[in-house]
Amino acid sequence: SDDFQRQVLAARELAKIKAAEEEASRLKAIAKQAADAAIADAESRMAWANENQIRADYEQEYKNASVAMVSAYVAYGNEDYLLSKQKAEEVSGIFSNDFQAQVAADRAAKEQLAKDKAAADEVMPKARDRMVWADQNNIKTDYSAVYNSAHSAMEAAEKAYQIEKYAA
C-alpha cells in the first residue's frame, strides 16, 4: 500500500538523518578532543612564557601568542573546535621548542656578557693605571719591547671593551 511505502521511505529518511547527526556528533567530538589537546599544549607554553617573563624581551611574540590564545578560547566557547585548535597551535608555534631554546641561548649569552663585563670592569682600571705608571716612569725608554707589547695589548683591550668583546 501507498501508506506503507511512505512509512518505509520516511523511516529510511529518518534513519539517514539520524546517521548523519550521529556522524556529525562523532566528528564534533573528535574535533573537540583535538582542540582540548592543542589548548593544553598552548596553555603549557603560555605558562612557560609567563614564568620566563617573555613579555619583557619578546613583546611582539608574546602579544601575538596572547591574541591567539584568547581567540582559541573564544572559538572553543563557540564550539568551533577546528578554529580553536588552529589558534592554539598558533600559540604553540610561536612559543615552539626552537623558540624556547633560542630564548635560553640568548639569555645565557646575555648573562655571560654581563659576567665578562664585570670581570673587564674590574681589571681595565688596573691595566690603565699600570700604563699611566709606565708612561710616568718612562718605561718605554728602558724596556721598549715590553712597553710596546703592553701598549698594543692595552689598545686592543680598549677597542674590544668598546665593542663589548669583554672576554677578548
Q: Would you name each region that the model predicts?
A:
Residues 1-168:
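Long, charged/polar, soluble alpha-helical segments
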